[in-house]
Design a protein with these regions (language model features):
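Generic structural signal for well-ordered beta-strand positions
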Residues: 1-2, 185
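NTP/phosphate- and nucleic-acid-binding module
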Residues: 66, 176-229
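An acidic, gly/pro-interrupted, aromatic-rich
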Residues: 2, 8, 30-34
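Residue-level structural signal for beta-strand termini and adjacent loop
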Residues: 4-7, 189-191
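Short solvent-exposed loop/turn micro-motifs enriched in small/polar/acidic residues
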Residues: 7, 169-171, 210-211
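Helix-rich, typically C-terminal accessory recognition domains appended to large enzymatic cores
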Residues: 13-189, 218-221
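A short local loop/turn or secondary-structure capping micro-motif enriched for an aromatic residue
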Residues: 10-11, 165-166, 194-196
Length: 229
């Protein structure tokens, strides 16, 4: 975009229709600062949807039943920690577009967690909300400040930048047992937390299994997948 070429965008109209956070986020997400870009209204719609989903996820998470000793959240807590690491690195290098991309990814991961879980420890709930709001704050200060103050009754601007837990960065693996009609045929070292569709894809690609040959597929997460013919 260039004023001399007459193809600039008036921000005032987008403030009114999409909000300042969505506009700021889209500008940062469009491309690296050194690159020229073509404005796309569909792109700002995408960042607005992301912010709406972020708000919805935090609200849903805040209402999740708190259960001491719950270990349901091990994987999502690790993913948040990985996001602290990646977003911090990208911001330090002024790679704003990839920082936004990482935040969109962790927001999708949180959506999956909320879809499949009904409880969480208070410690993990607080950790996730505090860190995700803090990571997104430089790029979307209005929505994150409001969400943060509503949950913690604190000002987000006074919150320290999150620190990476270096011991909780690497995804642990387990030995997946692949059975056919209840008999073990293969094993594979696999990341924990994979969904059934992801495990089926591994079996199809790596072990040349034709999934349509089987009448039923039984999947026990992080343990066994059994193909019944």
């Amino acid at each position: 975009m260039s004023k001399s070429k007459g193809n600039t965008v008036d921000p005032e109209s987008y403030f009114a229709t999409h909000g300042a956070d969505a506009l700021r986020l889209y500008i940062l997400f469009m491309a690296p600062p050194s690159d020229g870009v073509e404005w796309n209204d569909g792109g700002i719609e995408g960042t607005k949807r992301f912010l709406n989903k972020f708000w919805e996820n935090i609200e849903t998470l805040s209402k999740l039943k708190e259960l001491d000793g719950s270990n349901n959240e091990t994987n999502i807590v690790r993913k948040v920690n990985q996001s602290i690491n990646s977003v911090s690195n990208h911001l330090n290098k002024f790679e704003f577009n990839t920082a936004v991309s990482d935040l969109m990814k962790i927001n999708n991961d949180l959506s999956k967690f909320l879809k499949n879980n009904e409880d969480i420890s208070k410690e993990s709930k607080d950790m996730i909300i505090r860190n995700l709001c803090t990571l997104l704050f430089p790029m979307a200060p209005h929505i994150t400040s409001e969400v943060f103050e509503e949950y913690f009754n604190e000002d987000l601007i006074n919150t320290a930048w999150p620190q990476v837990d270096t011991k909780n960065l690497k995804d642990p693996t387990y030995e997946l047992v692949i059975q056919i009609n209840g008999k073990k045929r293969h094993t594979r070292q696999t990341d924990i937390g994979l969904e059934q569709s992801e495990v089926e894809e591994i079996c199809k690609v790596e072990f040349n299994m034709n999934l349509s040959d089987y009448k039923k597929i039984i999947y026990i997460p992080d343990k066994i997948i059994n193909f019944v013919g």
